[in-house]
A protein has these predicted regions:
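Extended, subdomain-level signal for the structured scaffold at the beginning of enzyme domains
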Residues: 1-83
Length: 84
């Protein structure tokens, strides 16, 4: 598989595994993944959340990781990417 440039748009309180796992997996197979968030810059972090069913009628929410952004949203040009 040839390396692709991928843009990942995320934000505060994103589901932890829905952000961390694809980001790490895509990079592990050789893709360049730029993670951005509106209003935040490279080096900033977004809060993630872990939702868990613990026997109640709905899920509980717990703090997840601080996910570090590695690109600036403001200077991102979608035309520079192979995938979103």
């Amino acid at each position: 598989m040839s390396s692709k440039r991928i843009l990942m748009i995320t934000g505060d309180f994103t589901e932890d595994y829905e952000t961390m796992v694809p980001f790490q997996a895509l990079m592990a197979v050789g893709h360049q993944v730029d993670a951005v968030c509106p209003g935040k810059a490279s080096g900033d972090t977004v809060a993630t959340a872990i939702h868990d069913f613990e026997g109640d009628q709905t899920y509980s929410e717990k703090p997840g990781h601080r996910f570090a952004l590695n690109a600036d949203f403001a200077s991102t040009n979608p035309a520079d990417y192979d995938a979103l």
